[in-house]
Amino acid sequence: MKRLLSLLTGVLVMTGLLMALIFPQSAYANVSDDKLGDRGEKVDLNNSSVRAFRQFPGMFPTIAGKIVVGGPYASVSDASSVLDASQKSVFDKYKDNFTVTDQEIAVNEGFDRINDGQYR
């Protein structure tokens, strides 16, 4: 009986290893990876975290926080509606670096867009 269980366990392990080789890793990709790949080099106003705005001087954290909390947006120019006059001028300076795609729940769940847990 012990040999039979050992044999069955070995067969199951080998089957699992073979299945991992047969199915490509792209089959395991999740929605978040697809969404983040869609936007290219631009920052997606509907799906990016506040941290993504650090590359634009003057936007992190105040303007970025307002944009993240104020979404979703239909177009890039809609994001300026949550900003005051001085913040709009900073936003307009970097406007070409932003894009808008449909919101994805996997990226926007909870407070992950405010604090995505990336620390130095």
UniProtKB/Swiss-Prot annotation:
What family, per the record? Belongs to the PsbU family.
Please provide the Gene Ontology terms (biological process) for this protein. photosynthesis; photosystem II stabilization
User: Keyword set for this entry?
Assistant: Electron transport, Membrane, Photosynthesis, Photosystem II, Signal, Thylakoid, Transport
Quote the subcellular location field of this record. Cellular thylakoid membrane
- Species source reads Prochlorococcus marinus (strain MIT 9313)
Which Gene3D superfamilies is this protein grouped with?
Answer: Photosystem II 12 kDa extrinsic protein
Q: Source organism's superkingdom?
A: Bacteria
Complex formation? PSII is composed of 1 copy each of membrane proteins PsbA, PsbB, PsbC, PsbD, PsbE, PsbF, PsbH, PsbI, PsbJ, PsbK, PsbL, PsbM, PsbT, PsbX, PsbY, Psb30/Ycf12, peripheral proteins PsbO, CyanoQ (PsbQ), PsbU, PsbV and a large number of cofactors. It forms dimeric complexes.
Q: What does this protein do?
A: One of the extrinsic, lumenal subunits of photosystem II (PSII). PSII is a light-driven water plastoquinone oxidoreductase, using light energy to abstract electrons from H(2)O, generating a proton gradient subsequently used for ATP formation. The extrinsic proteins stabilize the structure of photosystem II oxygen-evolving complex (OEC), the ion environment of oxygen evolution and protect the OEC against heat-induced inactivation.
Q: Which gene encodes it?
A: psbU
Spell out the GO cellular component terms annotated for this protein, sorted alphabetically and separated by semicolons: extrinsic component of membrane; photosystem II oxygen evolving complex; plasma membrane-derived thylakoid membrane
InterPro entries recorded: PSII_PsbU
Primary localisation category: membrane
Where would one find the signal peptide in this protein? Answer: 1-29
What name does the UniProt record give this protein? Photosystem II extrinsic protein U
Membrane topology listed for this record: Peripheral membrane protein
